[in-house]
């Protein structure tokens, strides 16, 4: 599969905890939090790319997530689709791929603040 030059797709997941609170999937890199970012492969849709990334890299059971929203964000002047999913804590493994963590809503707001998001996702 050929990678399209510098085209990416972003994603996050809202995790519904058993106590009723929520956490969000983020990538922690160099003391910075960001969305999960996947390179777009030729012949695959943005949705297929992010689902494959979440499954293979982040170790999410993608059969147990629901698509909530699709919006657009800009990362370094690049137009990047942002997929937002949700899932229940009981449906996911505790351990995520390297660098991926579940963060509190306040931290997610700070992640959103670092991007130019068209139509802030509703969650």
Task: Describe the residue ranges of each PLM region.
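Generic detector of short, locally flexible boundary/turn motifs and exposed helical patches
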Residues: 2-3, 28-32, 45-52, 121-122
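Nudix hydrolase/Nudix homology domain
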Residues: 29-38, 42, 76-123
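Short, structured secondary-structure boundary patches
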Residues: 5, 55, 84-87
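N-terminal strand-loop-strand
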Residues: 1-36
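The catalytic Nudix box helix
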Residues: 37-69
């Amino acid at each position: 599969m050929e990678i399209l030059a510098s085209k990416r797709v972003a994603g996050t997941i809202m995790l519904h905890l058993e106590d009723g609170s929520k956490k969000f999937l983020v990538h922690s890199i160099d003391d910075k939090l960001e969305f999960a970012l996947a390179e777009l492969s030729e012949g695959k849709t943005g949705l297929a790319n992010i689902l494959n990334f979440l499954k293979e890299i982040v170790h999410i059971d993608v059969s147990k997530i629901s698509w909530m929203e699709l919006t657009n964000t800009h990362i370094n002047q690049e137009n990047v689709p942002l997929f937002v999913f949700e899932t229940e804590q009981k449906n996911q493994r505790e351990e995520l791929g390297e660098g991926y963590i579940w963060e509190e809503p306040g931290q997610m707001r700070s992640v959103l603040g670092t991007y130019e998001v068209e139509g802030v996702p509703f969650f």
